[in-house]
Amino acid sequence: MSTLATSQLVATHAGLGVPDASMFRRGGVQGLRAAARASAAAGDALSMRTSACPAPRQQPAARRGGRGGRFPSLVVCATAGMNVVFVGAEMAPWSKTGGLGDVLGGLPPAMAANGHRVMVVSPRYDQYKDAWDTSVVSEIKMGDGYETVRFFHCYKRGVDRVFIDHPLFLERVWGKTEEKIYGPDAGTDYKDNQLRFSLLCQAALEAPRILSLNNNPYFSGPYGEDVVFVCNDWHTGPLSCYLKSNYQSNGIYKDAKTAFCIHNISYQGRFAFSDFPELNLPERFKSSFDFIDGYEKPVEGRKINWMKAGILEADRVLTVSPYYAEELISGIARGCELDNIMRLTGITGIVNGMDVSEWDPSKDKYIAVKYDVSTAVEAKALNKEALQAEVGLPVDRKIPLVAFIGRLEEQKGPDVMAAAIPLLMEEDIQIVLLGTGKKKFERMLMSAEEKYPDKVRAVVKFNAALAHHIMAGADLLAVTSRFEPCGLIQLQGMRYGTPCACASTGGLVDTIIEGKTGFHMGRLSVDCNVVEPADVKKVATTLKRAIKVVGTPAYEEMVKNCMIQDLSWKGPAKNWENVLLSLGVAGGEPGIEGEEIAPLAKENVAAP
């Protein structure tokens, strides 16, 4: 689905599923949501052919592996904690197309380190060698029949990773998942994505009740019903509706709560309004999905909107940075026609962390010279020379080297970057471009190399080793995003002592400090259909300003400032804990300050 940020049609309060315009109010970027809606009437019978009786509350297992035990130093610190179940369409490293996968890969271990029992539920897109068949199945109502799903499981870094096995997932994706999670090609969706992700939502609600998991040194058995479900992006929008209609109306999961996290507002799951019956939800939820926009796809006029339902039906709404939260409620353009809804519910922004073990210049096997903050300046110069040689640019450590790394799609602004390159060629500069995505953007980058072969290199293929090498060898990162909910690239750059010249949007505002860890270009237009000349000028002007600093004492200070930042998941996990505790789930207690289990082979234990 292409970005929705350019729509100029104002959604009416009726189209938003709110009965009266007077109900709108600003809940605040970090405010609690509005007063709870009236309780739903008694719902339909359970749609799952599994035991409908309340699951037993999980009990902490006898402690083992404490200091001097099974894992003497790297262990999860156990407390009563909370039972937290993350649900998402992606989960790194098993499946990933962007930041969503990284969050569901990195945040759960940090939550587990604080003593919470944590599960992540995601589709089984491939035959993952480390995930074992639990032999547990569930039959889920889909349309007029039932579909059988199986649950696969592995326990890694203190987290139960649960994979939903069904042909709708497994038979679609072969080899590297990449863009094939949502469709056969970038920008093309599978026609039955509603069925696929409805299945994910319903299966995820079963997992905590019916899976008896015993790998955790501190907890055993089912998670029980005192659970917080953390839904992620539009694919999990209906989960709160299924929780209320299929379970809570039958006395199950009575105290369970849901949080809904927006990773990218431009992908909302908009489908034909006539498709609502396929979700097998009571009519009372129709208004939460009801939506009118100005687009002709998938059909013109009235639609259902999965993200809108996810926002309205959740107990708490979050997103991945405070400034992005402010942008989402600022108006139609950046809120993509859901700004009114988010002003009603309130929204909390928490900046993401990153995997500091994968991205560590002191241990990185992909770079020529390893380094830390004390050796960064000289080591980065040596890595630059190695990078120049690798990509075929003139080897000269004195030439400022600017890198652009990102998915080649409208959000990341590769067209803006490409348009700015000619304005930079009068400078003594080298530019390395790395990314894959839409063919038109790949051609733009390759064209820049063809036009300026002595100054520009474009690599339009996936190359993880080169990405690490660029981080270590580049003097500056250029981030030309039209919008950026949080951003990972700038965090990786700071980890490697590479200041960022970035657009002033979303998480880039929260993480990059002008003159200390990077340079701000100002806000770029969110209209993805045109390249604004003013934006091109902002990019070129900022990069010219930045390269003049490279090689100076001020630049060396910026390198050090970048490398001393705490970019791990530890701080974000504590913020997430505070938000989830505020939901008041029975039995939930604050965690303690623990350390994550390192990603060592002995911890990668699959279910027997």
Swiss-Prot record:
Transit peptide, residues from-to: 1-77
Cellular component annotations (GO), alphabetically ordered: amyloplast; chloroplast
InterPro entries (alphabetical): Glyco_trans_1, GS/SS, Starch_synth_cat_dom
Catalyzed chemical reaction(s): an NDP-alpha-D-glucose + [(1->4)-alpha-D-glucosyl](n) = [(1->4)-alpha-D-glucosyl](n+1) + a ribonucleoside 5'-diphosphate + H(+)
Gene Ontology MF terms: ADP binding; alpha-1,4-glucan glucosyltransferase (UDP-glucose donor) activity; IgE binding
Lineage top rank: taxon: Eukaryota
PANTHER family: GRANULE-BOUND STARCH SYNTHASE 1, CHLOROPLASTIC/AMYLOPLASTIC, GRANULE-BOUND STARCH SYNTHASE 1, CHLOROPLASTIC_AMYLOPLASTIC
Cited CDD domains: GT5_Glycogen_synthase_DULL1-like
Keyword Transit peptide assigned: yes
Family, per entry: Belongs to the glycosyltransferase 1 family. Bacterial/plant glycogen synthase subfamily.
UniProt-annotated location(s): Plastid, Chloroplast; Plastid, Amyloplast
The protein's Enzyme Commission number: 2.4.1.242
Tissue expression remark: Seed specific.
Major enzyme class: transferase
GO biological process, one term: starch biosynthetic process
Name of the protein described by the UniProt record: Granule-bound starch synthase 1, chloroplastic/amyloplastic
Pathway where this protein functions: Glycan biosynthesis; starch biosynthesis
Predominant location category: plastid
Gene3D superfamilies xref list: Glycogen Phosphorylase B
Keywords, in A-Z order: Amyloplast, Chloroplast, Glycosyltransferase, Plastid, Starch biosynthesis, Transferase, Transit peptide
Binding residues for ADP-alpha-D-glucose: K96
Gene transcribed to yield this protein: WAXY
